[in-house]
Amino acid sequence: MKKHIISIILLSAALPSWAQDHAAIPQLDDNLRRLVAPYQIEPPKRTVGKITLFGGSPESPQSKTLIIHPTDTPNIFSIRLNDGESERVSLGFLGLWEDMDIEYSDPQWVFRRKLKGYSQDTLWQTAPAGTQFGYSSSTKTTISERGKQNDMAQPASDENQNYIRYSCAIKREIPARTLHKNIQGSAKEIRCIGSENSNWLGLTGYYLADYHFYIPLKLLTSLPSIEKWSITEFE
């Protein structure tokens, strides 16, 4: 018995820090699972546990780290993001493609958003370059000041207040190692615009086919600056 305990301790010490920080596998509620069930594909060939990004706006570049764990449902991941100033925890469908349940907090505020509706008109996950598609989502949002409660969620009869539709296109498919030397397989470059946000001119991201994980890397807005990110760690 003592040998087994020592072996477990040694094994834990040999793991990277993100792997040691692994609580019980999150259990999804049935409502979230049903929202994406029509768009599910087979489980990914490969897994990723940690991604570090560097960039943002040229005026104030920063680094942010994502710690990723599987859940009890394929292609839905538990993601903890830390940028050094704040932390958010979310459940993401296909990585950062769609936040299903997200909590963000700082010293003063707690922000919570839960996915209430989701649809896409094409199974873009397996579609070739050149494919155009749309998807939409609706969410319920709660913002509370620490020590107070201020529910800003729209009433159930008026969910369209938090409804948005996106128009997207798969522009090309590239070797994933172009983004980082550790990434295997191919990556689809996807560009989207949000029809309900006039300031949001476009988002470019990459879907890592072997990992079933989407990462947004460039945001273009009507403001002077452009947010651009690069992958500095992938393990």
Q: Where do the protein language model's features map onto the residues?
A:
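Acidic, serine/threonine-rich low-complexity disordered tracts
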Residues: D21-W109, T142-E235
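Boundary at the C-terminal end of the N-terminal hydrophobic targeting segment
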Residues: S17-A19
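Sec-dependent signal peptide recognition
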Residues: K2-I8
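Mid-length scaffold segments of soluble, non-membrane domains
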Residues: L115-N162
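Short, intrinsically disordered low-complexity segments
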Residues: M1-K2, R112
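Short, linear, compositionally biased motifs with a strong N-terminal bias
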Residues: L10-L11, A129
